[in-house]
Amino acid sequence: MNKTFTKNIPVNEILHLGEHLEYKEGQVISITIAQNERLSITLFALPKGEEISTHVTVGDAIVQILDGEAHIVVGDTEHNVKTGETLIMPSEVPHSLDARESFKMLLTVVK
């Protein structure tokens, strides 16, 4: 019997991750793919107008934009991150994400 360490998503298939969640007006949608004490991988969909307010994480946070464009503030630096682009937010630095346009992302936090 094979043991799988991921959840909520098919294994041994070619995937377009952004197709596994939909935008819902007024809601931030998330699907956890993997999580343990050293790693967290989560899909997010933020419709236009939603945000993830300023916070810090223990661990580097790697954001990969799958669809749309995210406005991300890391410390005092602002970024507009578009489809296909990646931004690494260092551990324990305050950051926030704003959907000036709808976007989907894959978030990987490594501790």
Question: Which residues does each predicted region cover?
Answer:
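Ligand-binding loop in jelly-roll beta-barrel domains
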Residues: 91-111
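Conserved short histidine dyad/triad with adjacent acidic residue
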Residues: 26-27, 37-57
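A cytosolic small-molecule/anion-sensing beta-strand core signal
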Residues: 37, 66-67, 82-83, 101
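Glycine- and acidic-residue-biased ligand/ion/polar-headgroup-sensing regions
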Residues: 59-71, 75
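A short, N-terminal "cap"/entry segment at the start of jelly-roll beta-barrel domains
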Residues: 1-38, 73
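Short acidic-glycine-tyrosine-enriched beta hairpin
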Residues: 76-91
